[in-house]
UniProtKB/Swiss-Prot annotation:
Keyword terms: Antiport, Autism spectrum disorder, Cell membrane, Cell projection, Disease variant, Glycoprotein, Intellectual disability, Ion transport, Membrane, Phosphoprotein, Sodium, Sodium transport, Symport, Synapse, Transmembrane, Transmembrane helix, Transport
Signal peptide: none
Pfam families xref list: Band_3_cyto (PF07565), HCO3_cotransp (PF00955)
Keyword Transmembrane: yes
Comp. bias intervals (Basic and acidic residues): 77-90
Gene this protein is translated from: SLC4A10
Free-text note regarding domains: The N-terminal cytoplasmic domain is likely to have a high level of intrinsic disorder.
Tissue expression remark: Predominantly expressed in the brain.
Record's catalysed reaction(s): 2 hydrogencarbonate(out) + chloride(in) + Na(+)(out) = 2 hydrogencarbonate(in) + chloride(out) + Na(+)(in)
Protein name: Sodium-driven chloride bicarbonate exchanger
Length: 1118
C-alpha cells in the first residue's frame, strides 16, 4: 500500500473541534483507577500553554494571532482537501533542510507549540493465574531511568545508548505503520478505537483479532510508585525519606503522606462505552519466555500484588518527582509488548490535539500528547523494548521533539529520524560495552546549530560576530548632557526599587546576611584599630563602626548596584598615615585638613558623575579586572595567614621545655633592674613608687602596664609562655576554612534531600561560625576574642562628631587640599568602578541593570559626610562584594533527574546589604554576644572568602597550564583558537603586572597604587602590538574602537530586517546554489536506502504485507 493512500484514509478519521476558545484539559474516563488530586498538590502541572518556548534559534518570541475566526475557514479548507493534514512541505535535498523548514514554520494555533515532555515506557506483562497489566519499565525527562531488575527502585539517570539497528527498525515502523496526527480524543478507549479502525481499514490488522488487541490496550497500568494501601508507611524508613517529606513545599506538605481518593478525579465530558479492564478475557500464552538475553521482562520484576477490586485501590502521586517536571509539561506514552495471537506487528504513532489527561496511563497526572504503540508476536521482546527506547530517546532529543510537535505528515517524522541519524555518534562494538551506563554530562551542548540553516563559506553566521567591549551596555554610553548618565541610571533603577525589597523574602537572603555580617564586622573593627594606632586615637574602632554603618545603609538604599558591599581599603589607610604624619610635623589639625581633602574629593567625584566619566569603564577589560581582583584576593589570603602568625607574638610557646622540670616551672613579675627614663618619668607623673608595689602579686596586664620584667622557667622574652592558645587558634583557623568549604559544597553531595542540602549550603559559613563558637566555648581555652566598643562616643574626649574644614589651620590649607584630593579621587574612582565592573559582569546575568554614575554619586556624597563627621572613608570592597554575589546565586529548582541545575542569575535586592550595616551599627549594644566569637575563626573566614573568590578567574586557569601537558589540558575555548605560546605570553604579562602591583601595595609607595591600576589600561592597549585582534577577542575583551558604533548600527539594521522577514512569514533557506552544487553534502536518507540492513528490513516488511493480503478482512484498503 502506498503511503499517500494511507494518508488519504486517515483524513476522515480526524474529527475537528468546533470550539474556538482556549483549550481546556478535560481529563479522561477510561481508567478504573480514578485519582483525586488536591488543587495545591498539582499546582503548576495542570496549567498549559502559558509560558512556551519557540524552538527556532533566531526567533525571540511567538506571534499570537488575534483573528481566530480564520481558523475555522482554514480547517474547513483542509478538511475538504485530500491531503493528510492540509499542509504540504516543499521537497528538499537533505533531511536537515526539511527539519529546518519544519521548525521555521509558524502555526495559527498553540497546539503545535512544543512543550516539555515526560516520556514513559510501559511493557505488557502477565503472570500465571493473574490478569495481564502494563508495567512501567523506563522513563525519560531528560535522561533515561530504568526500573532495576529487582523491580523495587529506579536506576540512576544515564545517557541512553541505542543500537543503530533499533533506530532503523523505528524508522521502518514510522514509514510503514499507522500515523495519526492531531487526533481529537478524550479517552484511551477512543484512541484505541481510532487506531485499530485505521489498522483494519488499511489491511494491517485482521478484524478477527481487533477485539483482543483492543482489550490488551485497555489493560490496567501499574507504575513504579504505586503501593498498597496497607503498606504505604513501612515500619522502617530511611532518614532520606523522612527528610524528603519534610523538604516538600508547604503547599504539598499536608498531602504528601496521603493517598488520593477516587471521588473527585477529573471526569470526562463524554463518558460512554466504558469497558472495565479487569473483565478482559484475553488469553495470553505462557510462552513469553522468548525474551532475548540482555533484557529483563517487566514480568520478571518483583511485583506488589494488589488484591481486591480496582475501585478499592487508590493511586499515590510521587510529589517529589512531580517537582522535577516543568510547569506545562506533557506526556509521551510508549506501549510495547508481545501478544501470542499476533503474527505481525501493530505499530501506531498518535499525536493528540488537544493533549488529554488520561487517568492511570502516565506515572504523573499530566496531559498526554503523544502515544507510540508497538505490539507484535512472541519471541521479539528485546527487539520491541529497544525500539521503544529508541522512540523515547528521540522524544527527548531537542530537535526531534520539536519536529514531532510541528510535523504535518509521516514524511516529516521520517525526516526528523534521518536528521537525528545524521547527528549521532557511533561507538565501535569491540571498544565499548553497551551495558555500561554513561553518566549525564555537566554541560549539555546547545542544539541550536541543528535548527538554523548552514551558511555558505566566507560569510559569518548570524549571532557569531566578533565580540566587542565586555562593558559596552547602554549604561556606559556618553549622553553629552550634564548629569545625563545619572538621570538614565535613576530612570533605569527606579522601576525596580520596590521589587528590590520584595525579592528579598528568601532563606538565601537570611543566610547571606548572617554570613556577611560576621565577615564585614572584623575588617571594619580591625581597620578602625589600625587607624587608631596611626592617628593616636583620633579615628578608631567606634568611628569606623559608625561610618561603615551610616555609609552602608545610605548606599544600600539608594545605590545603583546594591549588591556591592562597601568597606575599607589598604590605600586609604596608607593615605591616612601619611596625612597624619604630615600634619604632626607641621603642626596642623589632622581632622580639619582631612575634612577639607574629603570635601574636595567629594566635589571632584560629583564632577566626574556630571561629565559621564564612568563611561571610561569600558576601557577596563578582563585583563585589568582579573589583575585587580586577583591581587585583592591574594591580599585577603595573605593577611589572614599573617594575622594567624601574629598570634604567636601574643601567645608564645616554650620550644625548649624539659618535661622533667615541669614541677619547677613558674613565671613571676619583678621590678625592672634598669628602668628606662621614660618609665621613671611615667612613674613620677603617676606618683608610683617601685618599692611600694608588690610585684609578685601583679597580673600579666598589670605587670606590662608598669613595665615590670618576667622571671622564671615559664617566661619568654616579653611574655609568659601561654599553653595551648596558639595551637588551639591554628585548629580553629583551619577547621573554619575546611568546614566552610565542605558545607558550601554540600549542595552537590549524595546525602539528604535537595531542600536540606540547599539550606545547609546557603548557611554554610554561618553554621561554621556557630559551630566553632560553641566548640571554643565548650573547650574553654582562652583564645583571642572579637573586641567591640561598648559605648557610643568618640574615642577621644577632645573631639566631637562634627569637624570644621578650616579649624585652627591657616586659610590656605583649604585651597591647598585640592592637590591630595586629586590623588584621593583617582583612588576612590578606580576602587569603586573596577569592583562595580566585576559585579556587573554579563556572566552574572543581572536583570535589573547597573548604575555606575549613581554608585559614584552615593560614594561621593557619603565621603563628604564622613569627612565632616571625622569618620573613615569607605568604598566598594572587591572580595566582600564578590562573596555577596556568590551567596545570592539562583539555580533552577525544576531540573530533570541527572541534569545539572541551571544558573539563572543573582537574587538582586537591597535588603541583605541594608541589614548587614543596620546590624553593624547596632553592634555596640551586642557586645555581650559578640565577645564569644574567636578571632581565629574570623581569620579563617577571610581565608575562605579570598580563596573562593579566586574561582572562575581565568587568570589562574591559565597559570595551571604551565605545568600541564597538552593532552591533559582542559578544553578551554581559547585553547581551540589561540596558540599555546600566545596564551603563555598573555599570562606572563598579566603575572608581571600583578607582581608589580603587589610590590607597590605592600611598600611605602602604596599611595600611588590607584595610578598603577590605571596604568594597566595602557599596558593592555600596548598588547595590541603583540597579539592579533582575534587572539585578544578570545583571551580578553576587545578594546572599544571608533568604528564600534557603525558596526552596532549595521547589526541593528540586520536584526530589524530579519524580524521583518519573520513577520512576513518568510524563512530563507539556501536551498539552491549551495547544497545542490556542494558534493560534500550527503543525503543520509538516500545513503540509508543503499545499505544492506535497510534492504533487509524492507524485504521483511514486504513479506509481512504479502502474508497479510491472504487474511480475510471485512474492509479492504482503498
Amino acid at each position: 500500500m502506498e503511503i499517500k493512500d494511507q494518508g488519504a484514509q486517515m483524513e476522515p478519521l480526524l474529527p475537528t473541534r468546533n470550539d474556538e476558545e482556549a483549550v481546556v484539559d478535560r481529563g479522561g474516563t477510561r481508567s478504573i483507577l480514578k485519582t483525586h488530586f488536591e488543587k495545591e498538590d498539582l499546582e503548576g502541572h495542570r496549567t498549559l500553554f502559558i509560558g512556551v518556548h519557540v524552538p527556532l534559534g533566531g526567533r525571540k518570541s511567538h506571534r499570537r494571532h488575534r483573528h481566530r475566526g480564520h481558523k475555522h475557514r482554514k480547517r474547513d479548507r483542509e478538511r475538504d482537501s485530500g491531503l493528510e493534514d492540509g499542509r504540504e512541505s516543499p521537497s528538499f535535498d537533505t533531511p536537515s533542510q526539511r527539519v529546518q523548514f519544519i521548525l521555521g514554520t509558524e502555526d495559527d494555533d498553540e497546539e503545535h507549540i512544543p512543550h516539555d515532555l515526560f516520556t514513559e515506557l510501559d511493557e505488557i506483562c502477565w503472570r500465571e493465574g493473574e490478569d495481564a497489566e502494563w508495567r512501567e519499565t523506563a522513563r525519560w525527562l531528560k535522561f533515561e531511568e530504568d526500573v532495576e531488575d529487582g523491580g523495587e527502585r529506579w536506576s540512576k539517570p544515564y545517557v541512553a545508548t541505542l543500537s543503530l539497528h533499533s533506530l532503523f527498525e523505528l524508522r521502518s515502523c514510522i514509514l510503514n505503520g499507522t500515523v495519526l496526527l492531531d487526533m481529537h480524543a478524550n479517552t484511551l478507549e477512543e484512541i484505541a478505537d481510532m487506531v485499530l479502525d485505521q489498522q483494519v481499514s488499511s489491511g494491517q490488522l485482521n478484524e478477527d483479532v481487533r477485539h483482543r488487541v483492543h482489550e490488551a490496550l485497555m489493560k490496567q497500568h501499574h507504575h513504579q510508585n504505586q503501593k498498597k494501601l496497607t503498606n504505604r508507611i513501612p515500619i522502617v524508613r530511611s532518614f532520606a525519606d523522612i527528610g524528603k517529606k519534610q523538604s516538600e513545599p508547604n503547599s504539598m506538605d499536608k498531602n504528601a503522606g496521603q493517598v488520593v481518593s477516587p471521588q473527585s478525579a477529573p471526569a470526562c465530558v463524554e463518558n460512554k462505552n466504558d469497558v472495565s479492564r479487569e473483565n478482559s478475557t484475553v488469553d495470553f500464552s505462557k510462552g513469553l519466555g522468548g525474551q532475548q538475553k540482555g533484557h529483563t521482562s517487566p514480568c520478571g520484576m518483583k511485583q506488589r500484588h494488589e488484591k481486591g477490586p480496582p475501585h478499592q485501590q487508590e493511586r499515590e502521586v510521587d510529589l517529589h518527582f512531580m517537582k522535577k517536571i516543568p510547569p506545562g509539561a506533557e506526556a509521551s506514552n510508549i506501549l510495547v509488548g508481545e501478544l501470542e495471537f499476533l503474527d505481525r506487528t501493530v505499530v501506531a504513532f498518535v499525536r493528540l490535539s488537544p493533549a488529554v489527561l488520561l487517568q492511570g496511563l502516565a506515572e504523573v497526572p499530566i496531559p498526554t500528547r503523544f502515544l507510540f504503540i508497538l505490539l507484535g508476536p512472541l519471541g521479539k521482546g528485546q527487539q520491541y523494548h529497544e525500539i521503544g527506547r529508541s522512540i523515547a530517546t528521540l522524544m527527548t532529543d531537542e530537535v526531534f521533539h520539536d519536529v514531532a510537535y510541528k510535523a504535518k505528515d509521516r514524511n516529516d517524522l521520517v525526516s526528523g529520524i534521518d536528521e537525528f541519524l545524521d547527528q549521532v555518534t557511533v561507538l565501535p562494538p569491540g571498544e565499548w560495552d553497551p551495558s555500561i551506563r554513561i553518566e549525564p554530562p555537566k554541560n549539555v551542548p546547545s542544539q541550536e546549530k541543528r535548527k538554523i540553516p548552514a551558511v555558505p563559506n566566507g560569510t559569518a553566521a548570524h549571532g557569531e560576530a566578533e565580540p566587542h567591549g565586555g562593558h559596552s551596555g547602554p549604561e556606559l554610553q556618553r549622553t553629552g548632557r550634564i548629569f545625563g548618565g545619572l538621570i538614565l541610571d535613576i530612570k533605569r533603577k527606579a522601576p525596580y526599587f520596590w521589587s528590590d525589597f520584595r525579592d528579598a523574602f528568601s532563606l538565601q537572603c537570611l543566610a547571606s546576611f548572617l554570613f556577611l555580617y560576621c565577615a564585614c564586622m572584623s575588617p571594619v573593627i580591625t581597620f578602625g584599630g589600625l587607624l587608631g594606632e596611626a592617628t593616636e586615637g583620633r579615628i578608631s574602632a567606634i568611628e569606623s563602626l559608625f561610618g561603615a554603618s551610616m555609609t552602608g545603609i545610605a548606599y544600600s538604599l539608594f545605590g545603583g548596584q546594591p549588591l556591592t558591599i562597601l568597606g575599607s581599603t589598604g590605600p586609604v589607610l596608607v593615605f591616612e598615615k601619611i596625612l597624619f604624619k604630615f600634619c604632626k610635623e607641621y603642626g596642623l589639625s589632622y581632622l580639619s585638613l582631612r575634612a577639607s581633602i574629603g570635601l574636595w574629593t567629594a566635589t571632584l567625584c560629583i564632577i566626574l558623575v556630571a561629565t559621564d566619566a564612568s563611561s571610561l569603564v569600558c576601557y577596563i577589560t578582563r585583563f585589568t579586572e582579573e589583575a585587580f581582583a586577583s591581587l585583592i584576593c591574594i591580599i585577603f589570603i595573605y593577611e589572614a595567614l599573617e594575622k594567624l602568625f601574629e598570634l604567636s607574638e601574643a601567645y608564645p610557646i616554650n620550644m625548649h621545655n624539659d618535661l622533667e622540670l615541669l614541677t619547677q616551672y613558674s613565671c613571676n613579675c619583678v621590678e625592672p633592674h634598669n628602668p628606662s627614663n621614660g618609665t621613671l618619668k611615667e612613674w613620677r607623673e603617676s606618683n608610683i613608687s617601685a618599692s611600694d608595689i608588690i610585684w609578685e602579686n601583679l597580673t600579666v596586664s598589670e605587670c606590662k602596664s608598669l613595665h615590670g620584667e618576667y622571671v622564671g622557667r615559664a617566661c619568654g622574652h616579653d611574655h609568659p609562655y601561654v599553653p595551648d592558645v596558639l595551637f588551639w587558634s591554628v585548629i580553629l583557623f583551619f577547621s573554619t576554612v575546611t568546614l566552610s568549604a565542605t558545607l558550601k559544597q554540600f549542595k552537590t553531595s549524595r546525602y539528604f534531600p535537595t531542600k536540606v542540602r540547599s539550606i545547609v549550603s546557603d548557611f554554610a559559613v554561618f553554621l561554621t561560625i556557630l559551630c566553632m563558637v560553641l566548640i571554643d566555648y565548650a573547650i574553654g581555652i582562652p583564645s583571642p576574642k572579637l573586641q567591640v566598643p561598648s559605648v557610643f562616643k568618640p574615642t577621644r574626649d577632645d573631639r566631637g562628631w562634627f569637624v570644621t574644614p578650616l579649624g585652627p589651620n591657616p586659610w590656605w590649607t583649604v585651597i591647598a587640599a585640592i592637590i591630595p584630593a586629586l590623588l584621593c579621587t583617582i583612588l576612590i574612582f578606580m576602587d569603586q568602578q573596577i569592583t562595580a565592573v566585576i559585579i556587573n559582569r554579563k556572566e552574572h546575568k543581572l536583570k535589573k541593570g547597573c548604575g555606575y554614575h549613581l554608585d559614584l554619586l552615593m560614594v561621593a556624597v557619603m565621603l563628604g559626610v564622613c569627612s565632616i563627621m571625622g569618620l573613615p572613608w569607605f568604598v566598594a570592597a572587591t572580595v566582600l562584594s564578590i562573596t555577596h554575589v556568590n551567596s545570592l546565586k539562583l539555580e533552577s529548582e525544576c531540573s530533570a533527574p541527572g541534569e545539572q541545575p541551571k544558573f539563572l542569575g543573582i537574587r538582586e535586592q537591597r535588603v541583605t546589604g541594608l541589614m548587614i550595616f543596620i546590624l553593624m551599627g547596632s553592634s555596640v549594644f551586642m557586645t555581650s554576644i559578640l565577645k564569644f566569637i574567636p578571632m581565629p575563626v574570623l581569620y579563617g573566614v577571610f581565608l575562605y572568602m579570598g580563596a573562593s573568590s579566586l574561582k572562575g578567574i581565568q587568570f589562574f586557569d591559565r597559570i595551571k597550564l604551565f605545568w600541564m601537558p597538552a593532552k591533559h589540558q582542559p578544553d578551554f575555548i581559547y585553547l581551540r583558537h589561540v596558540p599555546l605560546r600566545k596564551v603563555h605570553l598573555f599570562t606572563i604579562i598579566q603575572m608581571s603586572c600583578l607582581g608589580l602591583l603587589w610590590i607597590i601595595k605592600v611598600s611605602r609607595a602604596a599611595i600611588v597604587f590607584p595610578m598603577m591600576v590605571l596604568a594597566l589600561v595602557f599596558v593592555r592597549k600596548l598588547m595590541d602590538l603583540l597579539f592579533t585582534k582575534r587572539e585578544l577577542s578570545w583571551l580578553d575583551d576587545l578594546m572599544p574602537e571608533s568604528k564600534k558604533k557603525k558596526l552596532e548600527d549595521a547589526e541593528k539594521e540586520e536584526e530589524q530586517s530579519m524580524l521583518a522577514m519573520e513577520d512576513e512569514g518568510t524563512v530563507q533557506l539556501p536551498l539552491e546554489g549551495h547544497y545542490r552544487d556542494d558534493p560534500s553534502v550527503i543525503n543520509i536518507s538516500d545513503e540509508m536506502s543503499k545499505t544492506a540492513l535497510w534492504r533487509n528490513l524492507l524485504i521483511t516488511a514486504d513479506n509481512s504485507k504479502d502474508k497479510e493480503s491472504s487474511f480475510p478482512s471485512k474492509s479492504s484498503p482503498s
